[in-house]
Amino acid sequence: MQVIRQRRISEKQQVNLFGRHVGRRALLVTTGIAVALGVTGTAVASTYQFGTQQVGQTTANGQVISSDQYIKPYGSRTVINDGKIMSSTVSPDGTRLAASVTDGDASLVVMDLTTGQIKQKIGTSTADDLRISSGAVGQEGPTYSPDGKQLWLGQADGYTKFTVNADGTLASPTAVPIAADGAKQALVGAAVFSADGSTVYSAVNGQNKVVAIDAATGTIKQSWAVGTAPRGIALVGGTLYVSNEGGRPAKAGDTTINSYGTDVPANPKTGASTTGTVSVIDTADPSAAVGTIAVGLHPTAVYAKKGAVFVTNTADNSVSVIDTRKGKVVQTIATQPWPEASVGYEPNAVTLTDDGRLLVTLGRANAVAVYRYSSPQQPARYVGLLPTDYFPSEITTVGKKVVVSNTRGVDALRPDAAGHNTHDTTSSLTRFTLPSDLGVRVQTAKVFKQNGWTPGSVKTAASKSHAKAVPVPARLGDPSTIKHVFLLVKENRTYDQVFGDIPQGDGNSSLTQFGANVTPNQHALAQQFGLYDNFYDIGTNSAEGHNWLMQSDNPEYTESSAGEYTRSYDTENDVLGHQKSGFIWTGAQAAGKSVKDFGEFQSLETKPAGATWQNLYCDSKNMAATGAETAYPIKTGSAIPSLNDVSVQGFPLFDLDVPDIYKEQIWQQDFEKSGPANLNMFWFSNDHTGGPANAAAEVADNDLAVGRMVDKITHSKYWKDSAIFVVEDDSQAGLDHVDGHRAPVQVISPYANHSTVDDHYYSQITMVRTIEQILGIHPMNQLDSAATPMYGAFTKKADTTPFTAVPNRTSLTLGVSPQPSCGSDTPAPQDTKAAAAPTTVSVPAAEKALAAQWKTWASHQRLTGPNAVPDYANPTQMNRYTWYQTHNWTKPYPGDSKIYAPDDVPGAYLPSPESDG
């Protein structure tokens, strides 16, 4: 346990690639916005307040985090450097806090609440104080027995039961398994003990049931069928109240989308679930039918006190209050503090103080909402907000102190001597005594400031707007000079990995793996259209990253599933991973715009026989030379009907057995035949690495595909009114000297500022808001509603000079075995002024045995084939494998003293937080 010292970063001077200074244009940009406001009367969102600040920097407003927010919590803070807290509980005597954690060096930690020190770490590492067999942890728990002598930790296949020593540490881990139901593991949710401690009632999330377990023997005594994905649970007398995140079972005639083998009632357009329920179980009468109470969407936490059961409706942004005497909802409390947006606050925990103050954590707003509450029938009165750390997820009281567990703590700032990575995750506890109502209101203003919530952030044009067209209009629906937006999604790279070798930017070349001789097109695009060296991806991994791009949010369901990712990983085909406000494509359609999707957010793929990497590589060359259609038509699809309707067949999704230049040819044929839509989305994924070719070759393939695509667009009749955004889904697969979330982005348009270095803070959220503003798409939630569009990246004066793709300098067939029948790829000469890229796959004799071990390891990581899963591999291992390949097995990974075997990598004991099971 330690408190992280915040990095203090001085503002640097930004240098134009051609000598123009734009780094100090914060005043200019602000002035431009003010002029726009003076003309239109439209207020603007407030993420421009970041200026050129960097993530991790401490400012007067708080610490900058990667989600367009500041954090500066009320009360005291204790940072936990052992990963993200998934759930936590306080011991009955109030002296200890037990927290399940993930993405770090433990699965469970026990903290002394008096000293703030970690007393014990439990996990799968040899360095942990107590070893257990599995590191996977569930969404809810752990749970103490009423006498404090036992603690039960929820895991994928049941529980691990511990005895509690006199000093609060744990001992004697014992498995309490719950058998799988076919392919469905238990995936236990919350648990609660009977008053006498003899029975544990468990919400078996993966099997849609609740079970009663004998606490002494682990035997299941009784089982009740409930709704879909039971999660929270509370015991009031002899009655259980269980939240079903997926709602009621589907009925005949329902439109449904699957979640972990269960069909869930769903909206076919938004892909979101449409019901939420609480199951009511009489534990004293085994024959009694299970009752059902309808609540809001995605009911998660359940808390009972003073004749009421409180249920957080995470997707509906409300709290249902159930009167236990009446057995029904008697009031619904709104948790939508900012009038500009009704979605995206994500209430996820609740408690009631003895003096009648209801406290609700708002995970995505980094705040606790405070209400005055007296009884179930008397409407609660909103008081205000208290700031927390990043993504609060649990709240309780210990004496007069409020204790808040924050899943993401202070963001990815775990100490790392080699550089920063998104998996350097932290969590934190914040503790405070509740201030007076006046004090809460004072803190409310700080929460608004930290979130950028300002009045008038979302304004729409009048029905008959006569505004002059500009690239990024100030009001939604006003005309834009840009009619066609292309969103190209790539995989996993940090800024330093790709652009660290560009001296004009804020880079560190020692961390650059894919410099100018691997990514000549991205470097040329940066030279022509501008370099952005202060842009951030928000997610830790692909499960989160694609959500941020498509929903401008990573829903709480995915956030809280990171301890095991067994229900789903990428939630494209999981109804519970979708917000009720829909996606960027549904917003475009609602605005009357056309959409085409090429692989992005899709989840289904069928390939014909013979569709190997080698054959598809040769096929792409034939298509380019002759214009012939592919010889290997690939079928793709989505579980979301609205995405299926706009998907272009034949364009593969994530599949490292498919070259990206093949994908580019599939797109090019459609482009030539039918032209672009208003919104065009793509998934070019081979810079993920791990496929048949050497890592450098895969990134070169990705680079060439992007370069050719931009070449084609910029030489077409559509170029004059187009904008292309090239972005990574996340930046987890490498290191960055500023922050692990810093990533490359490219803004390509006649209206983009050309040949500049822009060091203003931007993020995936501000990029999404820019696209929304261009196409007139209403923002999806409070995050993109608060975001300032990337006004500073655009200019009113068009420069229609096209881009000409640069030949690849790294062989695309490097490392492929056998080589394609059409011959090996011969690259262009490398730039001798840039760092050399691999030209052969050579392994020093001393490392051949290690390289063979890595090859075997890679074959088990689901990187290719019909069951390929993005980021299935453990990230600490995958990042080293890629590094070793790009350095010909001659150089240790940054911060390491040697080249490791897969099982010896520090962190290799971790279950992959990206594994889908």
What are the functions of these language-model segments?
Residues 35-37, 429, 771:
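Residue-level signal for nonpolar/aromatic packing positions in well-ordered secondary structure
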Residues 425, 440-917:
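N-terminal pro-sequences and low-complexity stem/linker regions of secreted or lumenal proteins
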Residues 8, 13, 33-35, 44, ...:
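Intrinsically disordered and other compositionally biased segments
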Residues 1-22:
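N-terminal secretory signal peptides that target proteins for export/translocation
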Residues 39, 166, 326, 376-379, ...:
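Short, structurally constrained coil/turn elements
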